[in-house]
Amino acid sequence: EKLIGNPLYHWSHLELQRYFGYTGHLCGDTAEEVWNLCNEQLQNKWSVRSLIKASNVTLICTTDDPIDSLEWHKKIAEDDTFDVQVLPAWRPDKVTNIEKPDYASYIGKLSEVSGVEIKDFASLKEAIKNRMAFFAENGCSVSDHGLDFVLYHPASEETIDGIIAKRLSGQEVTREEMMQYKTEFMLFLAREYHRINWAMQIHYGCKRDNNTFRYNQLGPDTGYDSINNDATAAQLADFLNALSTTNELPKTILYSLNPADNEIIGTIMGCFQDSE
């Protein structure tokens, strides 16, 4: 009852009516009734597959980390009883977010899975190319990036080597170093997407995990995110222009969680409609 005005209110009631035949009002007083109704039908009437089929879904793209084995995608692809395509989508946020506490340990896992010892930018790119080839073999053709904002702080490969070495040694990176690394890593990825004909999807405009007290209690992504307004039009335009200049701008999907960015995105996208 506290969600009126939010799309979640409409979506929730639409799904309850469409799949479970419930036409009432979901609130604290009816929560147990709705819970029991849905669970009874999930036991007897609905399965995950039947819900997918009833929704006329023909393709599902999951969000997958570069180190994922994709074992379930392989099993679904071999299952003749399910004709809905289920394909992986490439989500390398853990490689992008060099400032996060688990970056070094994650890079160790990426090294192991890719078979490449990652110690600098060149070896990181080699490992990423290996994993992208594996994803492509399993049907992937789209990426997904969750950024605070699209940035453009270019730097030399030597500079990025130093930033990676610094972070892998356990040191913190400065904000400028973080932005340089993310810029060059995203440019590298975008050029690879263009080369292998993947679409690049970028969404931004979210300030995550705002409530530290609740984060420590519940962990990340538990309902304490908000709209962010850090995005700058100039950096987005410069990022796309750097790729367009060398004719390496991939098919691109852009959207912000901040509706104030929509007109900016629309006008900037209009400047790059001649890319191959």
Where do the model's predicted regions map?
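A general structural motif
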Residues: 225-237, 257-264
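Short, basic/hydrophobic alpha-helical segments
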Residues: 239-245
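Hard-cation-handling environments
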Residues: 211
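Short glycine/proline- and charge-enriched loop/turn segments
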Residues: 215-223
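Histidine-centered catalytic micro-motifs
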Residues: 199-207
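Metal-cofactor-binding active-site regions of metalloenzymes
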Residues: 1-196, 248-266, 270-276
